[in-house]
């Protein structure tokens, strides 16, 4: 099956974070592709990737970048597909620089931005976007939400036992 989600990152060093999005996509059975596409080192590749994504069957792009973090915004400027930006943590500023770069897009070029390093939510957001068109993903999201509820209930149950037993 053709990939529905494109996961791109500016450098292989971003993979440490971006693989979390891929894990989510695999969990939900979403066909995807993963590539290193640098806005600064390979601008032609970035341009080609964004311009051909729709015709290749891609419906959502998840783009992770650190530092100046131009990849998500530049990708969004070249396609009308939804682009989800993942700010990658950096050594000097902890990823705040990446966050500001991705979230401060000019009017007309939206990038949905998740928390610094939170590619898990980027993957989940991509699945939610796809669930509008694909009912099987909506069903899996409902099941995922139920599992989260069960997990919280179990945590609360364990907490109550600990409190009752005198911390």
Curated annotation (Swiss-Prot):
Disulfide bonds: none annotated. It comes from the Bacteria. Substrate binds at residues 11, 14, 41. It holds the Pfam family AIRC. Keywords: Isomerase, Purine biosynthesis. One of its GO terms (molecular function) is 5-(carboxyamino)imidazole ribonucleotide mutase activity. Belongs to the AIR carboxylase family. Class I subfamily. This is N5-carboxyaminoimidazole ribonucleotide mutase. It comes from Aquifex aeolicus (strain VF5). The lineage of its organism: Bacteria, Pseudomonadati, Aquificota, Aquificia, Aquificales.
